[in-house]
Amino acid sequence: MRIERLYEVVRAPHISEKSTLAAEERNEVVFKVAVDARKAEIRQAVEQLFDVKVRDVRTVKMKGKRKRFGRLEGKRPDWKKAYVTLEEGNEIDFLGGAE
């Protein structure tokens, strides 16, 4: 896979209370990924970008929220997130040990 596609597939880490608990309890990392990305592509991208071994990938398509600005109504775009379970002994630290 080309390096450009790797960065298109894995867009950003998704940091939330739920994803932090998943990282601590189940060695899972949550990413925002491209809507057209397949599980095999996500696995390959994470393994190559972060130099870790992936055990499992689960994906969820998220609906964009409806938003209003005065009388104008709009909708945020739909997006996809991936729960990536890492093999034992592998970890990705996005916060750099910040307390």
Curated annotation (Swiss-Prot):
GO biological process terms held by the UniProt record: translation
Gene Ontology molecular function: rRNA binding; structural constituent of ribosome
GO cellular component term, pick one: ribonucleoprotein complex
Record flagged with keyword Ribonucleoprotein: yes
PANTHER family for the chain: 60S RIBOSOMAL PROTEIN L23A
Protein task: One of the early assembly proteins it binds 23S rRNA. One of the proteins that surrounds the polypeptide exit tunnel on the outside of the ribosome. Forms the main docking site for trigger factor binding to the ribosome.
Subunit structure, as described in the record: Part of the 50S ribosomal subunit. Contacts protein L29, and trigger factor when it is bound to the ribosome.
Name of the featured protein: Large ribosomal subunit protein uL23
